[in-house]
């Protein structure tokens, strides 16, 4: 979870406007307050929060988003997005986004290598997502293998490349 905070900090230092959306499960790993302090923006978790500025906040957020980066992305989030399930603030917002999307899966090696997870990542690729391969090494569960979230500076390079080299002429 600390890597997401470091990535957020690096983006803010580059004067990016960063808005963080977290799942309820993500808040068990790192407090939303961490990201609020780093970005100066309210972290969005609850789709039905009555303190939003806009009546339909996930649509307003999707409309003003230039790039989506989901890091780390659990197998659950990958599956939801691959199959169009929108049952929380993250998935409803992202499904409404028309901007470029990056996703960095991070999970246990066996979960990552599971054919179902690989199929879901292939679906996301077909829908235009850039899937960032996980790093290998010692995982949070103690196992060693593929499944680690890449280092923040590596994730930042994907973001900068996407911003610097838009794919407007892709396929032409």
Regions found by a protein language model. Give the residues of each.
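A cross-family phosphate/adenosyl-ligand binding-site feature
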Residues: 1-102, 109-171
């Amino acid at each position: 979870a600390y890597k997401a905070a470091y990535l957020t900090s690096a983006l803010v230092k580059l004067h990016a406007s960063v808005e963080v959306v977290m799942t309820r499960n993500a808040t068990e790993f790192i407090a939303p307050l961490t990201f609020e302090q780093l970005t100066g923006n309210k972290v969005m978790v609850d789709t039905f929060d009555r303190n939003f500025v806009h009546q339909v906040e996930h649509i307003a957020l999707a409309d003003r988003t230039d790039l989506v980066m989901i890091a780390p992305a659990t197998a659950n989030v990958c599956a939801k997005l691959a199959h169009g399930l929108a049952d929380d603030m993250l998935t409803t917002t992202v499904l409404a986004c028309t901007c470029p999307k990056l996703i960095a899966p991070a999970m246990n090696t066996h979960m990552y290598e599971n054919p179902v997870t690989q199929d879901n990542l292939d679906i996301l690729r077909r829908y235009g997502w850039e899937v960032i391969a996980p790093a290998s090494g010692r995982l949070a569960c103690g196992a060693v293998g593929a499944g680690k979230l890449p280092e923040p500076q590596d994730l930042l390079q994907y973001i900068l490349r996407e911003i610097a080299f838009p794919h407007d002429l892709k396929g032409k």
